[in-house]
Swiss-Prot record:
Coiled coil: none annotated. SMART domains: Aamy (SM00642). This is 1,4-alpha-glucan branching enzyme GlgB. Its EC number is 2.4.1.18. GO terms for cellular component: cytosol. GO terms for molecular function: 1,4-alpha-glucan branching enzyme activity; cation binding; hydrolase activity, hydrolyzing O-glycosyl compounds. It comes from Leifsonia xyli subsp. xyli (strain CTCB07). The keyword Transferase applies.
């Protein structure tokens, strides 16, 4: 090997242990050794420019200067080469020659300044970087005409970090990141690495062991079962400006919201994001839904988790296409007038050893105490909500989906598991908070931060809680101590109403309170009524399968039940397949039973859902005052013997909708119902109509109310109530 030139012999020495650590990729600050440096040399007045590079197997190494001149470097130690550039600091490339006659040349990653700025580092230290995805991860950069990728990762416990990938043979020795101080961030710009490259990080734990991990901030990943992160570039140009302007000026609470919940992989199997656009828009448009809610689309390794065990929080699953393909789908939905909601899972994450778990060799994203850091039921870890950087990771992730993908709302999964320290734990399996209580104060503060930040930055969006307890103030504003959610799933309504509708009509009178109790607390929170995927799996059967009686009676019960759901105060959500009465339980492994739409009875149910949505969207009484008791009035909630409910939904403008439900198996003739006005009332909807598969019992399109008071109402009308049916009446005034 070439000896050091005489001038280099006057350079200050570097400790051999440091050189060895650099050579093995285990040094925290490789840029302090490698790259280009101005150093003082003994006997020389001015600083000299020293170039050092790591090429452990080379026979000869040169720095190729902008002039085209070759500066030969000498071997220093452990594969590190060094030379003095008499021309002074400037750009250069490294060329290495090997014993087999091959040569390699590239820009030196260690000659570049940090690609992450002081403001970014300050915000990360403080846990306040609301656009974290623009600072961390893998970002394509052009630095002085040199294109490449800036890799940045937060790993505060690591002793060293290397990036490995298909661009370096999965050997990160030549690509060690520098530590950026107290921020816990590591950074390296690698020239020549571009879009589509796959990579992971190798992290040296305090224990001395190396762990290989995906990038927590990656915006794309390999398709499972492969797990590497992939460099992505977005080129999508949004065309939904009008939708976004309307959204920012609207209040989702006072508008219609009818949600179709969808598991992407089993709605129509083999469709990708882009390919699904036309079919999904046509289908949702025909049904009349205002919104679609996707089960989680963030990357997850196990399809059987339905997306609820996330490993790539910033990466849409690549099973169905690229991030731009998903943006295209959302863009198309918006232009078709359909809002998009997304399930979001900040409550727990899986223990896969290549993902977030023990990320830098010890608990980082998860709480270190298993009493707070593990979900035994699910076999997952729980985020450490008291760690400001972990909280920042999650808050920024919510914003990422809202802002980068134009998502209109997030449904937060398993909120109850976050709120309570003793959730699904034995008496000795949890630790009280600082006040001796069971509430998880850090998680509560996190949820408040998520909702407040989401609404501040993205007006018109909504954050929805799947929360199954009686925790107070879930939808109360954070300014008054609430969690700030826009809506809460009404699990009480769901459980009670399903228990009621399962009963044979002969025995429902004994369970009348189950169908009326939800009206007692309907305005204690802002509610959404869910018949979700959770109710049609794990042996629960389909919604149709919950209905008693023969096939006709099952469908009639279901028509009446859905009408009750649409008429009840609160927004509504129905899982895919239930709109046409799928008989079989849902499975993520196969598609829906689309063939059953060829059967007239099931097509009739589908027609009813179309009509329910059309009536709903056109009648502000059914949605304008969902969260205000002034939008509801009982006409008769006490007829347990007849299995009848009658109530008004009101819009505040004198155009109410009267809803009369007969959950008995027989028609009621000459049935008097109180109404607020005398005069004609149009039969706006009859679930027993022939077109819906019913028996055709009804009131010939309308009734006339007379000024005969009844049960507190100033007028009344005599009706025929169809069996297992619902009527919506609209005043003809």
């Amino acid at each position: 090997m070439t000896p050091l030139p005489e001038r280099a012999a006057a350079l200050p020495g570097i400790d051999d242990a440091v050189l060895h650590a650099v050579a093995t990729g285990s040094y925290h600050d490789p840029h302090s050794v490698l790259g280009q440096h101005q150093v003082a040399a003994a006997g020389i007045a001015d600083p000299v420019t020293v170039i050092r590079t790591l090429r452990p197997l080379a026979e000869a190494v040169f720095a190729v200067l902008p002039t085209g001149a070759y500066l030969e470097l000498a071997h220093l130690a452990h594969g590190i080469w060094q030379g003095v550039d008499i021309a002074g600091p400037g750009a250069y490339e490294i060329e290495a020659r090997y014993a087999d006659g091959s040569a390699w040349s590239a820009d030196d990653p260690y000659r570049f300044l940090p690609t992450i700025g002081e403001l970014d580092l300050h915000l990360i230290r403080e846990g306040r970087h609301e656009r974290l995805w623009t600072a961390l991860g893998a970002r394509l950069r052009d630095l002085g005409g040199v294109t490449g990728t800036a890799f940045t990762v937060w790993a505060p416990h690591a002793r060293a970090v290397r990036v490995v990938g298909d661009f370096n043979g999965w050997d990160g020795t030549l690509h060690s990141l520098r530590n950026m101080g107290s921020s816990g961030v590591w950074e390296l710009f690698v020239p020549g690495v571009g879009e589509g490259a796959i990579y992971k990080f190798d992290l040296l734990a305090q224990s001395g062991d190396w762990v290989r991990k995906i990038d927590p901030m990656a915006q794309l990943a390999e398709t499972p079962p492969d797990t590497a992160s992939r460099i992505a570039v977005s080129r999508h140009e949004w065309q939904d400006g009008e939708w976004m302007r309307r959204r920012a000026a609207s209040d989702p609470h006072t508008g219609p919201m009818s949600i179709y919940e969808l598991h992407f992989g089993s709605w129509r199997p083999d469709l990708g994001y882009r390919e699904a656009a036309d079919q999904l828009i046509d289908y949702l448009g025909a049904l009349g839904y205002t919104h679609v809610e996707f089960l989680p689309l963030a990357e997850h390794p196990f399809g059987g988790s339905w997306g609820y065990q996330v490993t790539g929080y910033y990466a849409p699953t690549s099973r169905f296409g690229s991030p731009d393909d998903l943006k295209y789908l959302i863009d198309r939905l918006h232009r078709a007038g359909i809002g998009v909601l997304l399930d979001w899972v900040p409550g727990h994450f899986p223990k896969d050893d290549w993902a977030l778990a023990r990320f830098d060799g010890q608990p980082l994203y998860e709480h270190a105490d298993p009493r707070r850091g593990e979900h035994a039921d699910w076999g997952t870890y729980v985020f450490d909500y008291g760690n400001s950087q972990v909280r920042n990771f999650l808050v920024a992730n919510a914003l990422y989906w809202l802002e980068e993908f134009h998502i209109d709302g997030l449904r937060v999964d398993a909120v109850a598991s976050m709120l309570y320290l003793d959730y699904s734990r034995d008496a000795d399996g949890w630790e009280p908070n600082i006040h001796g209580g069971r509430e998880n104060l850090e998680a509560i503060a996190f949820l408040q931060e998520v909702t407040a930040t989401a609404y501040k930055r993205n007006p018109g969006t909504i954050v929805i809680a799947e929360e199954s307890t009686s925790y107070p103030g879930v939808t109360a504003p954070t300014s008054s101590g609430g969690l700030g959610f826009g809506l809460k799933w009404n699990m009480g309504w769901m459980h009670d109403s399903l228990q009621y509708i399962r009963e044979d009509p002969l025995y429902r009178s004994w369970h009348h309170s189950r169908i009326t109790f939800s009206f007692v607390y309907a305005w204690s929170e802002s509610f959404l009524l869910p018949i979700s995927h959770d109710e049609v799996v794990h042996g629960k059967g389909s919604l149709l399968g919950k209905m008693p009686g023969d096939h006709w009676q099952q469908l009639a019960n279901m028509r009446a039940y859905l009408a009750f759901m649409w008429a009840h105060p609160g927004k509504q959500l129905l899982f895919m397949g239930q709109e046409f009465g799928q008989p079989s339980e849902w499975s993520e492994e196969r598609g829906l039973d689309w063939w059953i739409l060829d059967q007239p009875a099931h097509r009739g149910l589908w027609n009813l859902v179309c009509e329910l949505n059309a009536v709903y969207r056109g009648a502000p009484a059914l949605w304008a005052h969902d969260n205000d008791p002034s939008g509801f009035e009982w006409l008769d909630g006490s007829d347990a013997a007849g299995n009848v409910l009658a109530f008004l939904r009101k819009d505040g403008r004198g155009e109410p909708i009267a809803v009369i439900l007969n959950f008995s198996g027989a028609p009621h003739t000459e049935y008097r119902v109180g109404l607020p006005f005398a005069g004609g009332w149009e039969e706006l909807l009859n679930t027993d109509a022939d077109v819906f598969g019913g028996s055709g019992v009804g009131n010939f399109g309308g009734v006339t109310a007379v000024e005969e008071p009844w049960m507190g109402s100033p007028a009344s009308a005599v009706l025929t109530l169809p069996p297992l049916g619902a009527l919506f009446l609209k005043t003809g005034r």
